[in-house]
Regions:
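An N-terminally biased module of ancient metal coordination in phosphate/nucleic-acid-related enzymes
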Residues: 1-78
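Hydrophobic faces of well-ordered beta-strands that scaffold small-molecule active sites
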Residues: 3-7, 31-33, 97-101, 124-128, ...
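Acidic-and-aromatic substrate-binding clefts and catalytic sites of carbohydrate-active enzymes
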Residues: 9-16, 39-42, 75-78, 104-111, ...
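H/E-rich (His + Asp/Glu) clusters that bind or coordinate divalent metals
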Residues: 13, 180, 186-239
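Distinct, well-ordered alpha-helical segments
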Residues: 16, 109-118, 137-143, 164-176, ...
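Glycine-enriched alpha-helix->loop->beta-strand junction motifs that scaffold or abut catalytic
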Residues: 27-28, 120-125, 144, 148-155, ...
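Short, flexible active-site-adjacent loop segments at beta-strand->alpha-helix junctions, enriched
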Residues: 29, 37, 103-105, 132, ...
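Active-site gating/metal-coordination segments in enzymes
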Residues: 57-157
Length: 239
């Protein structure tokens, strides 16, 4: 089974028909989906920055730009509506959409929201994004969401903003080995390697081609082990 492990519900993943068409065209069985730009069919072309700076974590640059745009537009306020939209897509695509719920700081009690939506939607993972809004790994908000995910054996997928947040999440993960944690875009893989920190419940998302160089990808494979990474990834995704 082939699963797209990181997509947003906009562009070609906005409607049931376009999702099925995209998956079929690319020979993909399912997609892990979170909210995106609400009701937008727009497609954005991203230059291959990674090829220019193959040894750099260029996601840092896109993080700054994303945060600036989010401050100007306030689009994070649409994420909860986006969660509803992703659930509707799961109901109209015959099992081909796997829902991850995106949690934002606008939710007063994240654990209650997650409890209720788990009953209603049976989602398969939780998403956090430090570029769309400001919160830290050492905040009560993060700890509540992460603890809920750990206690419910639900993967937590996080897009980190900075190197300092990478250091914090490594320290958090050392104390929570049962948390199934996915780090988006190989962010901070260099620090994981430097500290030689890995465990059987730690995963790294490798999207996307324009942001992840072959050099950094090979370093990650050398560190984790290609066979182990693929096996873990497939077991997690299918289950």
């Amino acid at each position: 089974m082939i699963i797209d492990g990181h997509s947003h519900a906009c562009g070609r993943f906005l409607t049931p028909d376009s999702i099925v068409k995209t998956l079929d065209t690319n020979g993909v069985d399912k997609v892990i989906l979170v909210p995106g730009e609400l009701n937008s069919k727009s497609e954005y072309s991203l230059p291959n920055i990674a090829s220019i700076f193959p040894r750099r974590n260029v996601v840092k640059v896109t993080n700054y730009l994303t945060k600036f745009v989010m401050i100007l537009t306030g689009k994070v306020k649409n994420i909860l509506i986006g969660n509803e939209h992703v659930y509707e897509l799961t109901q109209k695509t015959n099992g081909r959409v796997i829902q991850f719920v995106w949690i934002t700081t606008q939710i007063n009690k994240p654990s209650n929201y997650l409890d209720n939506k788990k009953k209603d939607w049976n989602f398969k993972g939780v998403k956090l994004h430090q570029c769309w809004e400001s919160f830290s790994v050492d905040s009560d908000f993060f700890k509540e969401v992460a603890l809920w995910a750990e206690n419910n054996d639900i993967p937590l997928f996080i897009h980190l903003y900075s190197d300092s947040e990478v250091a914090k999440i490594i320290e958090y993960k050392k104390k929570h080995l049962n948390l199934n944690l996915i780090i988006a875009h190989l962010f901070g893989i260099e620090l994981f390697i430097k500290l030689n920190f890995k465990d059987e419940n730690l995963y790294f998302d490798t999207s996307t081609l324009q942001l992840i160089s072959k050099n950094r990808l090979m370093n990650a494979i050398d560190f984790v082990g290609a066979d182990v990474l693929v096996q873990r990834e497939m077991e997690f995704r299918v289950n």
